């Protein structure tokens, strides 16, 4: 009897261990996620626009590994609200997060939209993933406790020389006593070595993670700070781009003559260099040279990451997503900044690579960066999160589904929106004034066709896609270095906007 009892007990224990082993194996078999954010990266890279013969071989390499979206658009053309939207899966018009919001203040009890939201990295953590992150991921780094292993972020966008090279950071705001702050914008060769750059140090940290063994699948996030201003990288990256070889983007000095007043107010950026200033001072090509140099530096660091992943045990079972928070204008529409609802400010690179995805595929249909959250969940075999406001792109990548009816929405402040569909862009401002562009015939968006009867039905169709919700500015969200948004928040909220002394001081 006892023998029979112990035999049954042994069988039960063996069965339990087998089930436990199967469960562990099931967890390990889930794909890992390598999540890469690049700050202020526009579509000039070689696998998309290949502007001015830019040298970005590792972006080409990533494109060959998976799917490149050539017409992806940001939730907002500003770091803070764009990243908050991507990490929550919620539109700025839903949350009221239109400006810069401290990472720990995004999810709060007094914001009905975000009070119980699950951030993207958290969703993986809650589903058995080991979460890790370093660099600029949210507006600063990340909310407290976001990662099992966190590398943090070097504050600011340094290192900095003792004295700025060209731009004082105030621009015309000096005449307003600097009341709208000071930008980090400047350009020049600095420091002497890549090893002094925070992005290089962050990649070193990531490479250490690839050398470890994990019992769980991992979610590993890396946030690059360049090519965000200041446009400082070592001289060797500038040497790739002799000034005589630099192209400048198309520009018309009277381009803004048909823009509604709200659009002009939004484009009033007193601290930033204007295109006219850049032309007259001879600095235009130098600014572009510095931007291209910064992008090539990031490309090199990306190559280090791809090499390390390739040589790791995780090479065949890791999903890669690389994205930027918005585009960046290099003289288009009169300035050097993101900060607008036009194509050059909202469009940015988006790549996916990994198991069960085609290689070397390009998709030219407009899509949203907001789709990153649901797309990663589906690729990882995780249950969809009902709070996500955008659609997964998996079927589009795998089967070309949804190419004809896809669109992208960008929001900039309360009730200012752009809608991009294939070949057209519609912009509506809070006062109902409009812009409409036929991108097929007018890729530079120089001719506002909003009053052209020829496009009436198309305009109405795009207008129907605008968000139906336009939340009041979140109390903790501020954008006080731009005159129009200071006025908009103060006008629409009881509490006035809080002062910000320096652009990027909290980044």
From Swiss-Prot:
GO terms for molecular function: iduronate-2-sulfatase activity; metal ion binding. GO terms for cellular component: cytoplasm; periplasmic space. Gene3D superfamilies: Alkaline Phosphatase, subunit A. Binds 1 Ca(2+) ion per subunit. Sulfatase that may be involved in ulvan degradation. Ulvan is the main polysaccharide component of the Ulvales (green seaweed) cell wall. It is composed of disaccharide building blocks comprising 3-sulfated rhamnose (Rha3S) linked to D-glucuronic acid (GlcA), L-iduronic acid (IduA), or D-xylose (Xyl). Has no activity on different ulvan polymers. It comes from Formosa agariphila (strain DSM 15362 / KCTC 12365 / LMG 23005 / KMM 3901 / M-2Alg 35-1). The modification 3-oxoalanine (Cys) is found at residue 79. Keywords: Calcium, Hydrolase, Metal-binding, Periplasm, Signal. This is Sulfatase. It is found in: Periplasm.
